[in-house]
Design a protein with these regions (language model features):
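Extended beta-strand-rich architecture
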Residues: 1-258
């Protein structure tokens, strides 16, 4: 069971009334049946209840903004919302893997799992077939998180406090040419293993597939954020870290700089 369809009805209702720029969320219970959980002498053991959070995004990213007149919502916007929720709950994003997912709900989907294998949810582009059946003419982006499992996950997290760094973070971008089957999660993993102390965040801000690229290739534009809590990083340190990350991406994924 899923929360998806109730939210899609609201998307359709609002879109037909010219309120097409959608940002919805809903909490609700979902019920699943698994015959493998059936136990002799225990009634209803094969049924389970899961409290979930659903997120729906559709339409333009910015309402009537002259500076961004045609900026549509995207799966990257939805992913940012999901990541912000996880961060606010205290989940370490470096231990979260966004992997490719194939199912009937999404035309392009991602599973959201921890490095230990716990599935926290799914997200992606809702199948056009489903949208058509509900008379929805625009792309809809949807994420569903298991609040039940998230609460179990954050119970394991130790809450720590530290002074905000007085020293600035540094951002460096790489435009990478990669095989189409390479996932962003692989880039995150390799980069984190390359620099555990000073690499604070990694963000994918552009994906390109099409003209002027070799067959079977895609381009990822990735930002790397570096920061030392005790001092300002100099160019020599930054260049050394980025060179190490770049070399490891080349050796392990066959990545090339564009």
């Amino acid at each position: 069971q899923t929360l998806l369809f109730g939210g899609l009805e609201s998307v359709e209702h609002n879109a037909k009334r010219k309120n097409g720029n959608i940002r919805f969320f809903e909490f609700g219970n979902c019920y699943d049946y698994n015959i493998d959980h059936k136990k002799e002498g225990e009634t209803l053991a094969e049924f389970s209840e899961d409290y979930r959070l659903g997120l729906w995004v559709s339409g333009s990213r910015v309402d009537n903004n002259w500076a961004h007149p045609n900026e549509k919502s995207s799966v990257y916007e939805l992913k940012a919302y999901v990541e912000n929720i996880l961060v606010r709950l205290g989940v370490n994003l470096q231990k979260v893997i966004f992997g490719n997912l194939a199912n009937d709900i999404y035309s392009a989907g991602l599973s959201i799992t921890t490095s230990s294998g716990r599935q926290l949810g799914t997200m992606g582009i809702v199948s056009p077939k489903i949208c058509k059946e509900l008379d929805i003419e625009t792309d809809v982006y949807y994420a569903e998180l298991s609040w039940t499992l998230l609460m179990k996950e954050i119970k394991k997290s130790k809450v720590t406090f530290s002074e905000i760094s007085k020293f600035p973070a540094v951002k460096r971008d790489l435009a990478l040419l990669l095989d189409k089957n390479v996932q962003f999660a692989e880039i995150e993993k390799i980069a984190t293993e390359s620099e555990r102390k000073l690499l604070k965040n990694i963000a994918l801000f552009d994906v390109y597939e099409g003209k002027n690229l070799p067959a079977g290739k895609k381009s990822y534009a990735v930002s790397f954020y570096l920061q030392d809590e005790g001092k300002t990083l100099n160019d020599k340190q930054i260049d050394a870290i980025m060179k190490k990350i770049q070399t490891n991406l080349e050796q392990k994924l066959g990545a090339q700089l564009r």
